[in-house]
Amino acid sequence: MAGNTIGQLFRVTTFGESHGLALGCIVDGVPPGIPLTEADLQHDLDRRRPGTSRYTTQRREPDQVKILSGVFEGVTTGTSIGLLIENTDQRSQDYGAIKDLFRPGHADYTYEQKYGLRDYRGGGRSSARETAMRVAAGAIAKKYLAAKFGIVIRGCLTQMGDIPLAIKDWNQVEQNPFFCPDPDKIDALDELMRGLKKEGDSIGAKVTVVADGVPPGLGEPVFDRLDADIAHALMSINAVKGVEIGDGFEVVKLRGSENRDEITKDGFQSNHAGGILGGISSGQQIVANIALKPTSSITVPGHTINRFGEEVEMITKGRHDPCVGIRAVPIAEAMLAIVLMDHFMRQRAQNGDVTTTIPRW
């Protein structure tokens, strides 16, 4: 499996499976001298971890991260940072009955076609359990970007099913189990989730992630455009089926006179582009949206085949999220942070001495 690393100068490599002994990652490219403790990483891990509310999977993993290397006397040394999270609440017996079945909508069929075998316990490497390490690595990037440049990265749920959620109050996001920025919609979300749990079904969601304080100039045209790398990173998250930068697919409704972000001496007059022009950050707020499919791990009977080609009906057992979009919020934040950190390192390496007289806002 060659696709376990993201980034060029700030590089994150993850390993581990859903029901294996542990998850881990190696983070390369972290500058020396950054104060860093396990507590710095734990906050975002606690936001992502399972079993924290009745709306998410009841698999109870403490997700206590251990820093194995790269930190000495409380500061980074500039060498590889090794991180580890032990799995403690596996129930592999829940999956014994499906070892010869291909769960519809999951990676079972494609993994076995590619490798000739698969770890059927909770999806193995294809499980979203792997994203715990992305969140841990992303927390390092978030801390550096905030301390060095004042960049703030945050995300929220902006749609669940057919319920749109307006970004009314960022302070509300951490005050409810849905990462919802619209306090007027909490009851509707609660009602939807209760109904789904009763039916044994699931629902899709939309997550918005933004970065404020990003200076202009980040991005490497043409193939490593900033928006291209952000889209790549976000699309690599489990269950993501679509990525938008800025207005995304809504731009098809606009005319050029409406969509262009006009500039005056006071700055940009709009941000349809989502803070990126020509693959390079403009200094405006970076905005990205992701669409997450409803999980296929549901108790509604479905049709599939077994490895012998026989048609069977199956119900997925185990502990699963009725809406995977909820816990995707800190994951999306982490992936955006990893990409921005990598591009900061690349910009500093090539263009660190570049200065301009063009206004910045």
Swiss-Prot record:
Cofactors named for this entry: FMNH2
GO cellular component: a single term: cytosol
InterPro entries in the record: Chorismate_synth, Chorismate_synth_AroC_sf, Chorismate_synthase_CS
EC number(s) reported in the record: 4.2.3.5
UniProtKB keywords: Amino-acid biosynthesis, Aromatic amino acid biosynthesis, FAD, Flavoprotein, FMN, Lyase, NADP
Cofactor note (record): Reduced FMN (FMNH(2)).
Annotated FMN binding sites: R125, S126, S127, N238, A239, G278, K293, P294, T295, S296, S297, R319
HAMAP family documented for this protein: Chorismate_synth
UniProt cross-references to NCBIfam families, sorted A to Z: aroC, PRK05382.1
Record note on quaternary structure: Homotetramer.
Family in the record: Belongs to the chorismate synthase family.
The protein's name: Chorismate synthase
